[in-house]
Amino acid sequence: MSPIKQAVILAAGNGSRLASVSGSLPKPLVDFNGKPILEHVMLAAEEAGIEEFTVVVGYRGDVIKSHFARDPRFNITWVENPDYHKANGVSLLKARHHVHGPFLLLMSDHIFQPQTAAALLQQPIQNDEVILAVDEKLDAIFDMDDATKVCRMGDYIIEIGKQIRCYDAVDTGMFLCSPVIFGWLQTSKTDDNCSLSDGMRQMARRRKLRAFDIADGMWQDIDSPATLAYAEGLFGFPLPTFFAEKVIASV
């Protein structure tokens, strides 16, 4: 199999839970150790071997595109999602005509280590499946209530969702996808809306969703002042003073 060089990044949401520290910025541009969160995601993916990015934007997408236009180091194809108020599966569907084979799917607000993405990219993938990177270090999950949980049977995920009762790992927001995912999302739509988990749930029922354990790898989703502060500490970065003051006030 040829090396996978394309990543799709979902960056369309409005990030309302980070509003107290983001000011007027869209969430992907919120500062994390001197750089926007999205830039950290892209740098880590680039170090893992990604060369081509397809970034789906929606809320204040013009501001995000303008920021990266000033630094053309990344090869980016921008995709607009005017329906950014809908679930994230809709955002991924907007990218379907820009994908030309297996790809790495990332969230614009999930920080991770490059070696974790590199290890996922090395996994052999069939043309009818998706591989989800999962974390079984449950005691280390910062906000379990908000985490998307998975239940595995061997190498396969058999159930996925935030509310499932039986689980043994959590979804890290990092997927190795074959283009088949688009068909599953399309058939999962209800009222012209679907989440990634909706599509993954359909695949899990047919044993088409495999799990990849990140072992000692670190990651963190950043969707609130508290998780921003936690991620800064987890990755060894001091939280900027003015952010720290706002985080303390919001907790």
Features from the language model and the residues they span:
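Residues at the starts of beta-strands that form the adenosine-phosphate
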Residues: Q6, E51-F53, N75, P102, ...
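Conserved core of the sugar-phosphate nucleotidyltransferase
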Residues: Q113-T190
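Phosphate- and divalent-cation-binding pockets in alpha/beta enzyme and binding domains
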Residues: R17, H40, V63-S66, N88, ...
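N-terminal glycine-rich phosphate-binding loop and ensuing alpha1 helix
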Residues: S2-D62, I76
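Conserved beta-strand segments of alpha/beta enzyme cores
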Residues: P28, N75-T77, Y156, K208-R210
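Conserved alpha/beta core of the MobA/IspD/sugar-nucleotide pyrophosphorylase nucleotidyltransferase superfamily
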Residues: S2-A7, D168-V251
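Conserved beta-loop-beta/alpha segment of the NTase-like Rossmann-fold superfamily
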Residues: K65, D71-T148
